[in-house]
Amino acid sequence: MMGKCHCRDCQHISGGPFVPFVIVPTEAFRLMRGHLQYHFTESLKGGKHKRGFCANCGSRLTGAESDTPSPIVGLVAGSLDDPSWFRPQLDIFTSDAQPWDQMDPEIPKYEKYSPG
């Protein structure tokens, strides 16, 4: 799944109106070099959110719920070696979207998390 998260947390982290993300199975994710450093914050679901950052440059690379081992991980699309294939399929947390953010009217919108 590929989408854009418009929550205030993602706005703060990115310095922009949303974070473009790609959801992949955790076992399919492999860091090609270096290692991740993690930062934990309160999740919008009430638990903890685990963000992975490049230990060398500080770029945000991953995000996942951390209260339990997660079968999926969110990758920040702009951090991929080739993000040109990214095609958003949905917008989430549109209730937090900025009024000047021009969302694609052709993809589904969810006020909070997407169902499922």
Which residue stretches match the model-derived regions?
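A short Gly-Trp-Pro
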Residues: M1-G116
